[in-house]
Amino acid sequence: MNTDDKFFKQTVQILNNNNINFWLCHGTLLGIIRENRLLPWDHDIDFGIWSDEHSKEEILNFFSNNIEFKQTIVPEEMDNLNFFAGDKRIDINFYNRNNKIAYIKWIAPGNILSRFHYFMIYFIYSEISFKTTIESSNPLAKIIKILILLFLLPIKFILSHKFKNKLHNKLQQKINYTGYSYPIELMTFKYIDFLGESVPIPIESEKSLEITYGKEWKIPKQDYTWHKEAKNLLSQP
């Protein structure tokens, strides 16, 4: 069993053992439905849960006892948690819902200034350790983070809580978000067997995949860029 499959199974077991309602989504769902595997070129393994059923703190507690899952910083306003595990990132996506759609928002990559603002906010404001902050599978990204941290460390400890709040609010306005949305009627699930685990997926998985990846979702594309090519992007609802 390769490391991707191993951490997939471990994540499923952690969620199941703690009675978390979840489903497989995004590129993970795509790989399983199209190829019956986790896509080797995909950089993360995606799980969806409902934000009105479980909090980030609750999920963090469940993963904190496993030293192989290393948490990364995620802005509070983003609807997910990230853990590095092996060569991939485990993404726990907290979907919001109303009577029409299910939706999620993330920071929009590609805007370097926006990403820098986000990194500044959550290093200054977070209690997460230095080691976790610089965690990255990309050596260059890790070096860049270390250089930024050397600049930010004095700010973190010198600034008052009140000033940090003001800085947080000001920088937060400069961050751009987008995300996926699905008709709420597609968010019903069935169980399949994958890697020896019983896992939930949307009953109409193919329709869900077409909504995100388009009618050619069955054709592999290794250079897919979600924030430019997804068909169901939204601004903040």
Q: Each PLM stretch: what is its role?
A:
Residues 36-58, 196:
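Catalytic metal-binding acidic patch
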Residues 23, 47, 227-231:
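Long, positively charged, glycine-interspersed low-complexity recognition regions
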Residues 31, 48-50, 200:
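General alpha-helical segment detector with a strong preference for membrane-spanning helices
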Residues 12-45:
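Active-site nucleotide-donor binding segment shared across nucleotidyl transfer reactions
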Residues 1-12, 16, 63-114, 118-123, ...:
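Conserved catalytic core of two-metal-ion nucleotidyltransferases
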Residues 23, 41, 216-217, 226:
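Tryptophan-centered motif/residue detector
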Residues 30, 55, 98-100:
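Surface-exposed, flexible loop/turn segments at secondary-structure boundaries
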